[in-house]
Amino acid sequence: MTRGMPIRLLSDGDRFELRASADRSAFVLRSKTDFYVAHLLGEDASRFDADYLAVQRQHPAWKPDQALGQLWDHGGYMWFAAQEAE
């Protein structure tokens, strides 16, 4: 996915998990309850990074599931997702 770059855990909740490359050029947003995952690269990763930082600034007290759920549902990132392999 990221040409050998490690992906580290950035945010983790009961419903959602977010991983990112060190340079934030790639993100993996996962819905744990729905078993879907969105791989975001290039321009999609840049847009997601800006949206994620904006949600964090606007709602600093939100827990990971609130922030990531907002991006998943209302940010439209669920449309980038595919069902996880079994």
Regions found by a protein language model. Give the residues of each.
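Short, charged/polar N-terminal "headpieces" of proteins
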Residues: 1-23
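Intrinsic-disorder/low-complexity peptide segments enriched for small residues
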Residues: 7-8, 38, 66
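General secondary-structure edge motif
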Residues: 9-10, 32, 51
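A short, structured beta-strand/loop element
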Residues: 19-47
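Mixed-charge, Lys/Arg-enriched low-complexity segments
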Residues: 41-86
